[in-house]
């Protein structure tokens, strides 16, 4: 029970396909690091981004999201405008065990540049790519490097099974692929 180690993460990813693709070692020379670490896994950001813009002139409404609020971008380096925001997704696809919750925290390399990464918890039973929220809090444009590390995931095993997993309740983001915009169940 509790916070899971590198050996547990490796075993679950190799044997149970918890993380696909899975980097068994920490990769860190010449890149923002990614792969397994002592008590976590550093995820990579893909090369597709949705950058928020004010060109459409609409209001951001999570209950009725207008796709005119974002511009699609694909490339090795994404420039997030000053005081702006982008969405991306992980390269990795997750298959969460029914008794494990994952929490994701931004990497210090980006945080020290004013880049804040937010990802909501990966609930027990969740399957899919992870949509990543990236905020540039600086007055300057900021680079995000595709196919490199963006955040660290910590895995926490519950003391007892939960009554209902994300899969059981057919969560609205279950089995998401690509960047998923806000959804409201109707």
From Swiss-Prot:
It catalyses: dCTP + H2O + H(+) = dUTP + NH4(+). Homotrimer. It is an enzyme of class 3 (hydrolase). This is dCTP deaminase. DCTP binds at residues 107-112, 152, 166, 176. CDD domains: trimeric_dUTPase (cd07557). Pathway: Pyrimidine metabolism; dUMP biosynthesis; dUMP from dCTP (dUTP route): step 1/2. Pfam families: DCD. Its EC number is 3.5.4.13. Catalyzes the deamination of dCTP to dUTP. GO terms for molecular function: dCTP deaminase activity; nucleotide binding. Belongs to the dCTP deaminase family. The active site is at 133 (proton donor/acceptor). Disulfide bonds: none annotated. Coiled coil: none annotated. GO terms for biological process: dUMP biosynthetic process; dUTP biosynthetic process; nucleobase-containing small molecule interconversion. Keywords: Hydrolase, Nucleotide metabolism, Nucleotide-binding. InterPro entries: dCTP_deaminase, dUTPase-like_sf, dUTPase_trimeric. The keyword Zinc does not apply.
């Amino acid at each position: 029970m509790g916070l899971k180690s590198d050996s547990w993460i490796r075993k679950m990813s190799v044997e149970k396909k918890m993380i696909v693709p899975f980097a068994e070692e920490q990769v860190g020379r010449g890149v923002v690091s990614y792969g397994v670490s002592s008590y976590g896994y550093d995820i990579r950001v893909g090369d597709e981004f949705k950058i928020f813009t004010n060109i459409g002139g609409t209001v951001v409404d999570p209950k009725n999201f207008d796709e005119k609020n974002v511009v699609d971008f694909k490339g090795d380096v994404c420039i997030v405008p000053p005081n702006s925001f982008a969405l991306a997704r992980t390269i990795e696809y997750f298959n969460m065990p029914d008794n494990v919750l994952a929490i994701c925290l931004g990497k210090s390399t980006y945080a020290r540049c004013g880049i804040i990464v937010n990802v909501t918890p990966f609930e027990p039973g969740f399957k899919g790519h992870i949509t990543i929220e990236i905020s540039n809090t600086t007055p300057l444009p900021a680079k995000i490097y595709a196919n490199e590390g963006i955040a660290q995931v910590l895995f926490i095993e519950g003391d007892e099974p939960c009554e209902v997993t994300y899969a059981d309740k057919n969560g609205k983001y279950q089995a998401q692929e690509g960047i998923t915009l806000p959804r409201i169940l109707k």
